[in-house]
């Protein structure tokens, strides 16, 4: 039910964390890897494995370390209170750079109005800090520091995070061999160092979305030479969902692996909802500011102004939004190119700006004021996510003149943003059939000079409403392999309705599979360790390890237990699919045991000799496949 002022209890008193989001994973523990200073503590999840059964040699299996986006929520040593928000992680790092000031209060007009409205007290997050801003004339972006040759704490943090204790895994004897990858020109090193991170950010090939007002953030990096990331969307609408439900979706989404979260709220109380989300988020938060700006003018796109939009940017930057989707590439001359499309303009932001351009017959004010926007971005270190407002909404419209015209403009805007040392990534489609996906990636790399690409799927067919997490997961895996840096998840409810918690989880797991498959295909160092460990556990019938090493242990365990629920089945050398007599892995073990007992190694020599004799006889008789008898 939607939160209203009439029935809302004081959220600052009543709000509770989602119980499912704070449960530790079975046989896992939160570990922290310390950096060069005591306050750089990088979280990871360590999965403890059982000893190999004596039938298979009785080997001790080292724990497996995996990337963890769940923040403090899965650390049993941390007391979670969503009413107070998460602990401050970054303030000491920001203070040490001595280039920001603490403001006396909010500087946006809208923010001040909301704060002074007593009727909103019931909904308001109670522990709001005064915002920071760059000192006059200063630039506080990670790109600016990188281009000055400075390795920030955030850069060191993400380097440690990306490596996931790879050296220790090798030393512990984990199977680290992996198939050779094909990276399509990416420059993936054998080890991620802080200096490599700095170089990639300075070059514009990677970004660390990290607003100076999002001090609860655990930094992460987005770029084609790093692990492929995924984004999950949340947000209320005019038709439903409360603030507490959106915070629950946030914590639930990051539990299952969402690297960033976009708040796409379009209903009431957008400002208050966003404050609760950011204060409780350990991952970067993105928004589409034009959505809130449109709410401020009652939904009339033609009434939007630069002044109102500017105030919205400042309002959100002071709350701590880490990246903004800005549809500055929707130019007046591109709008007619969409007229003959099957599905026209499907981006909400794109359609808003197209309507404004036509109503005023003027150029998009986001384009004409782009350098003004850059000034705001670098004062708070908000990253650009340059929106693809003309993305195709059906495979029939893929790779058309409107889409690629806008992409070329986004490349132009990227260079302007880089001139201001503002971190930038590029949004992409959409609906694209498989044979056209690589062209999208190649053109983006060319137009945008390798700025990180961030795509919605793409969906590879339009015939599967209710299953678009699958149609898009196919495209996501492909474009991730080709070089896309972040994949925006799609849930089963895409095109159908607002997703619930189960839909969020399904979308995230689907996209974690796609991202991981892309990492394997690119040959990212250490990407196959988890696969190898799970395969070994499967062959040795270590059922609990199979469950716990998977992306979704709960579902794997429940599927197994549907037919074999007893604890004794957890040590059985078969599952219900094949049963005890037809398990291929059990049969393989029996063959190995027989070979060992019968000294098959010696027999192999005789077999090879016999095969060689038969081959020579075949040649001597004329190499004829068939003979008359």
UniProtKB/Swiss-Prot annotation:
GO cellular component: cytosol
Pfam name, any one: ThiC-associated
Pathway(s) annotated for this protein in UniProt: Cofactor biosynthesis; thiamine diphosphate biosynthesis
Reactions this protein catalyses: 5-amino-1-(5-phospho-beta-D-ribosyl)imidazole + S-adenosyl-L-methionine = 4-amino-2-methyl-5-(phosphooxymethyl)pyrimidine + CO + 5'-deoxyadenosine + formate + L-methionine + 3 H(+)
Taxonomic superkingdom: Bacteria
Stretch list, region Disordered: 1-20
Sites where the protein binds Zn(2+): 431, 495
GO molecular function term, any single one: 4 iron, 4 sulfur cluster binding
Gene3D superfamilies cross-referenced by the UniProt entry: 6.10.250.620, Radical SAM ThiC family, central domain
Co-factor binding comment: Binds 1 [4Fe-4S] cluster per subunit. The cluster is coordinated with 3 cysteines and an exchangeable S-adenosyl-L-methionine.
EC class of the enzyme, as a word: lyase
Residues that bind [4Fe-4S] cluster: 575, 578, 583
Single Gene Ontology BP annotation: thiamine diphosphate biosynthetic process
EC number(s) on file: 4.1.99.17
Cofactor(s) this protein cannot do without: [4Fe-4S] cluster
Binding sites annotated in the UniProt record for substrate: 233, 262, 291, 327, 347-349, 388-391, 427, 454
Family note: Belongs to the ThiC family.
Quaternary structure annotation from Swiss-Prot or TrEMBL: Homodimer.
NCBIfam families: PRK09284.1, PRK13352.1, thiC
Function: Catalyzes the synthesis of the hydroxymethylpyrimidine phosphate (HMP-P) moiety of thiamine from aminoimidazole ribotide (AIR) in a radical S-adenosyl-L-methionine (SAM)-dependent reaction.
Name this polypeptide is given: Phosphomethylpyrimidine synthase
Protein species of origin: Pseudomonas savastanoi pv. phaseolicola (strain 1448A / Race 6)
